[in-house]
Amino acid sequence: MDDSVNTRYPILLVHGLFGFDRIGSHHYFHGIKQALNECGASVFVPIISAANDNEARGDQLLKQIHNLRRQVGAQRVNLIGHSQGALTARYVAAIAPELIASVTSVSGPNHGSELADRLRLAFVPGRLGETVAAALTTSFSAFLSALSGHPRLPQNALNALNALTTDGVAAFNRQYPQGLPDRWGGMGPAQVNAVHYYSWSGIIKGSRLAESLNLLDPLHNALRVFDSFFTRETRENDGMVGRFSSHLGQVIRSDYPLDHLDTINHMARGSRRRINPVELYIEHAKRLKEAGL
């Protein structure tokens, strides 16, 4: 078997908002775990809430890390978090750095999401609209977790939204600043408390006319619409997270021609991308291995 990405420590893929490990044959990290396994990596997908705040999800993740260490005898783990999964991973690394070898943020809103800001403004706190929307999205999150075989996971969509706004993440960053850049658009420290920090992300590039077959992807089209909600990082975002907002630790690249869902390999059949998202994970696993992680 190919052992080119047989990292020293296991890799945990941490999903984001409305995420899951798998529903039937459909994986959140589509084709990524399988590809890493085939290249010799030991990969796990933890079971955490589809919608909740960063700390609640992080506490769930930490418990599973302890269980995994007992099961496989690993001293530490490598965390790769997509979207809110990056904040979940950062929280665990901040409170238990001795258990974490590395944190990698993939399209993570490490300085908040302007889309979350707009959604937050659309609902007046305590009013009926907010209550109804929160109830519906929480129920949807519970439905997703039930479909994935985990119906008892706690869900709170309003807490999740508040945790992803610019203000919410700013408060989070004051408590857990590890790996953050000291200037907007810069890189953060590559290592803090013996934890290595990395990030990569993409942006939606070009006009609709230039995208040809990508216009067949309805999710990509929706993310293109969401781009109009951004003011600080207009045309420098992936539809959900701004380019510079994603920066953490060693920034591998933050302008891949990929939208927010492309980075977990969710593309409509027939659409085309110049970058293979799965290869980014394989390359990164090689990077972790070369770093002794």
From Swiss-Prot:
Cited Pfam families: Abhydrolase_1
UniProt key word NADP: no
Sequence positions that bind substrate: L17, Q84
Enzymatic reactions: a triacylglycerol + H2O = a diacylglycerol + a fatty acid + H(+)
Domain of life assignment: Bacteria
Localization: Secreted
GO molecular function: metal ion binding; triacylglycerol lipase activity
Enzyme class: hydrolase
Major location category of this protein: secreted
Thermal effects: Optimum temperature is 29 degrees Celsius. Stable at 10 degrees Celsius, but above this temperature the activity decreases. The enzyme is completely inactivated at 40 degrees Celsius.
pH-dependent activity: Optimum pH is 8.8-9.
InterPro entries registered for this protein in UniProt: AB_hydrolase_1, AB_hydrolase_fold
Binding site for Ca(2+): D217, D262, H266, R269
Domain (AB hydrolase-1): residue spans on this chain: 10-206
A GO-annotated cellular component: extracellular region
UniProt record similarity statement: Belongs to the AB hydrolase superfamily. Pseudomonas lipase family.
Function: Catalyzes the hydrolysis of triacylglycerols, with the highest activity with tributyrin (C4), lower activity with tricaprylin (C8), and much lower activity with triacetin (C2), trilaurin (C12) and triolein (C18).
Protein known as: Triacylglycerol lipase
Organism encoding this protein: Pseudomonas fragi
Gene: lips
